[in-house]
């Protein structure tokens, strides 16, 4: 049976998602879990594939992989028990004939989180420049053979203390979303206007936009037009999520206090 799994991960521990010899990657951990369960012996013969690669430090809410196995029940029941705590499956589907997680995707959605957004309304207005089909050469590495991409939706909204850039497209170039985020961040800080994005999309490429830091990026969703059966998160991953949240809330508070002006008087009695 050709099984598809939707899964999430924190990207900070991995050297990207794509399999690399002697390096810890998301694919390497997933394939290792499949081998441990004897779902297949050779990942190539099992046609193991993912929807696309994410760089080191990039996270995923909805990555997708598929592979052939004659033990589908074992895969569905046990994968979450043997995967590391920072990778967990959230759904599964019996993949239709001809399915490939990369080439069968109808669209992909990414979110980029800005911790100090500035003018979010200006960022949202500038994000509309990305809509439609454009040459994104200025927003990707040099040498991409076909730099044209079609953006289906693009917006910036506020989520608590963060501004979130959410973009949906048929496909994306390497580092494209992070480069788009760089320009929106500049707009939010008043360092650029929406017209500069329009010029980068239509004019000759005189310079390429630098990519924003990877830790703010999440592969948010991939649409295949097929239903996935939800899978419950296992206890280990649930604890890991809670522990990470508590740690970062604590560190945010400590960092805020350490960043205060040292000339302020100490709190009495301490």
Curated annotation (Swiss-Prot):
A GO molecular function held by the record: RNA binding
Residues the entry annotates as binding substrate: 110
Superkingdom of origin: Archaea
Active-site residues per Swiss-Prot or TrEMBL entry: 55 (nucleophile)
One record GO biological process: tRNA pseudouridine synthesis
Keywords: Isomerase, tRNA processing
Protein name per the record: tRNA pseudouridine synthase A
């Amino acid at each position: 049976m050709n099984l598809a799994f939707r899964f999430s991960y924190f990207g900070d521990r991995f050297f990207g998602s794509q399999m690399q010899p002697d390096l810890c990657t998301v694919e390497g951990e997933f394939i290792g879990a499949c081998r441990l369960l004897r779902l297949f012996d050779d990942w190539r013969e099992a046609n193991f594939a993912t929807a696309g690669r994410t760089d080191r430090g990039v996270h995923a809410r909805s990555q997708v992989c598929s592979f052939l196995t004659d033990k589908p029940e074992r895969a569905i029941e046990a994968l979450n028990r043997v995967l590391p705590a920072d990778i967990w499956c959230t759904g599964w589907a019996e993949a239709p004939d001809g399915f490939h997680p990369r080439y069968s995707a109808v669209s992909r959605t990414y979110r980029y989180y800005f911790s100090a957004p500035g003018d979010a309304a200006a960022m949202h207005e500038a994000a509309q420049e990305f809509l439609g089909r454009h040459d994104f050469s200025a927003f990707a590495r040099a040498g991409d053979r076909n730099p044209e991409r079609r953006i289906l939706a693009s917006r910036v909204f506020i989520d608590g203390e963060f501004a979130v850039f959410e973009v949906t497209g048929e496909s994306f170039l390497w580092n494209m979303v992070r480069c788009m985020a760089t320009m929106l961040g500049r707009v939010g800080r008043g360092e650029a206007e929406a017209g500069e994005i329009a010029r980068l999309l239509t004019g000759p490429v005189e310079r390429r936009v630098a990519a924003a830091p990877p830790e703010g990026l999440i592969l948010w969703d991939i649409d295949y037009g097929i239903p996935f059966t939800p899978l419950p998160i296992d206890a280990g991953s649930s604890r890991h999520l809670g522990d990470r949240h508590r740690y970062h809330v604590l560190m945010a508070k400590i960092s805020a206090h350490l960043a205060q002006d040292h000339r302020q008087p100490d709190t009495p009695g301490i």
